[in-house]
Amino acid sequence: MQRFFSARSILGYAVKTRRRSFSSRSSSLLFDDTQLQFKESVSKFAQDNIAPHAERIDKTNSFPKDVNLWKLMGEFNLHGITAPEEYGGLGLGYLYHCIAMEEISRASGSVALSYGAHSNLCINQLVRNGTAAQKEKYLPKLISGEHVGALAMSEPNAGSDVVGMKCKAEKVDGGYILNGNKMWCTNGPSAETLVVYAKTDTKAGSKGITAFIIEKGMTGFSTAQKLDKLGMRGSDTCELVFENCFVPEENILDKEGKGVYVLMSGLDLERLVLAAGPLGIMQACLDNVLPYIRQREQFGRPVGEFQFIQGKVADMYTALQSSRSYVYSVARDCDNGKVDPKDCAGTILCAAERATQVALQAIQCLGGNGYINEYATGRLLRDAKLYEIGAGTSEIRRIVIGRELFKEE
């Protein structure tokens, strides 16, 4: 761990100022000084470099043009938290990845969603399933932020029904020809490297799907217009189009027909890391509400003195802390090699639904101001709702949990 104390490292990023917030060391639920310092450092980085752009990103539906957030996060070593040091990563575990996802989400939900798709869905898939040559070719630029990564699984008529995908990969001399479409691809418009799933055998069901590494600029590969979303605005999302797109054989991730294995073996970890996104949104809700209820007065005193307001913030706080405890606990288990599908699904089910409710309470605490776009609470609600839909809906997560419980004896 000594290398992290260099001037350019995360842990060496001085925490010169601390915002007044209940999110102190005593309530962080972290018990290791290195993890605490990591959290504080990422928090300061995100508040200094990402939070000032959050409102503009939401209004313009675009990342800022005057600053490259991808490279800034790369310089801060955030993209490769779980990647080996030999490729420029930090070689840390999923608890650290969750902490980073949480603090970036606290600053901007949309930046964090794009960050999660890049660092978790793309980079971590390559780390776990790529060959040495693939890792050498793709990881350094993805980890530095020079290139952006994405993952494409869903299709216009195949969302939760992954095996029902229609995108087809036909074997030809030296590779495959891809034809079809992918939908709702986060980072799609800007990604240089994409993990894409397609059917190599239409009669083999789940065993006929293969994962491919797609590069921007491949002949026959294009992106449709950027989608105009309710929330997570600025986190670019689009449809991918494949029209006789040739992909060389060396771009297969793992092996032909192993696509569902690649997908499912990483899905539990993807759900876990993405579950930290709602944690950051809930924290941001409290960051907005607590100063407001201290300053806003009605009937001659701060509204925070009223019992019903105190009850609301108590509910918000306990929703955050219980979700945070669950996510951190499961992350520690995963770092120790105990990956449980029902708990990975449970973390994001729990955190996502609570984040939506916490954001609604935040709006209510601000009253009329909560409904005005000048305040951040409306954006936080719109951003929170995505986590009940993306990366498997809440309904699918319940199915996963129920199925796993039924199988246990």
Curated annotation (Swiss-Prot):
Homodimer. GO terms for biological process: alternative respiration; branched-chain amino acid catabolic process; L-leucine catabolic process. The keyword Flavoprotein applies. Its main location: mitochondrion. It is an enzyme of class 1 (oxidoreductase). Residues 1-22 form a transit peptide. Its EC number is 1.3.8.4. Pathway: Amino-acid degradation; L-leucine degradation; (S)-3-hydroxy-3-methylglutaryl-CoA from 3-isovaleryl-CoA: step 1/3. Keywords: FAD, Flavoprotein, Mitochondrion, Oxidoreductase, Transit peptide. Disruption phenotype: No visible phenotype under normal growth conditions. It catalyses: 3-methylbutanoyl-CoA + oxidized [electron-transfer flavoprotein] + H(+) = 3-methylbut-2-enoyl-CoA + reduced [electron-transfer flavoprotein]. Belongs to the acyl-CoA dehydrogenase family. This is Isovaleryl-CoA dehydrogenase, mitochondrial. Expressed in leaves, stems and flowers. Not detected in roots. Pfam families: Acyl-CoA_dh_1, Acyl-CoA_dh_M, Acyl-CoA_dh_N. Its cofactor is FAD. GO terms for cellular component: cytosol; mitochondrial matrix; mitochondrion. FAD binds at residues 151-160, 184-186, 296, 307, 364-368, 393-395. Involved in degradation of the branched-chain amino acids, phytol and lysine for the supply of carbon and electrons to the ETF/ETFQO complex during dark-induced sugar starvation. The active site is at E270. Substrate binds at S160, S206, K207, Y261, D268, L269, E270, R271, A391, G392.
